Amino acid sequence: MDTKLILIEGLPGSGKSTTARLVHEILMQNGIESELYCEGDLNHPADYESVAYFENDQWHRLLEEYSAFRDQIIENCIPEDNGYLLPYKKLVPDIPDTFYEKVSKKDIYELPLDQNMKLIINNWERFSTRAASGKKYIFLNAVLYRILLQSV
């Protein structure tokens, strides 16, 4: 079996999450490898939930300004397209609120459209390459449609 991508779409409260969880659990109980990612999941492989993007100069200024948390910030960053991605909600809560206020302004969904689309397309290409090499079911709950709407 090749990897199967299953997108669950629907209106809020229509049973998307319940349906996705139920099918995922049935597959797993029957020994069929399956992954489930719901909207808002910080580990979602094809979404940038609470991820900021910084160009190199912005990144180095951020590290200087928050040098007390430098190691933790660097440990969680991902080099990307002449800059860095930072999944900022994955950082420990002892970082000051001013950090989160600053970083959330660089959230991928707050970037200019052309930059936003480039990062999202790169992420989907990476995701599809990884998924194609596997043999499992991957459920994405209501993310694709909203990502596309947010990107327009």
Enumerate the predicted regions with their spans.
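Phosphate-binding P-loop
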Residues: 1-3
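Hydrophobic anchor at the beta1->P-loop junction of P-loop NTPases
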Residues: 8
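P-loop (Walker A) phosphate-binding loop of NTP-binding proteins
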Residues: 11
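Conserved glycine(s) of the Walker
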Residues: 15
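Hydrophobic positions on the alpha1 helix immediately C-terminal to the Walker A/P-loop
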Residues: 19
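Active-site signature of alpha/beta-hydrolase-fold catalytic machinery across serine-
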Residues: 22
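Conserved substrate/cofactor phosphate-moiety recognition/catalytic segment
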Residues: 25-74
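ATP-dependent NMP and nucleoside kinases share a basic, alpha-helical "lid"
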Residues: 104-152
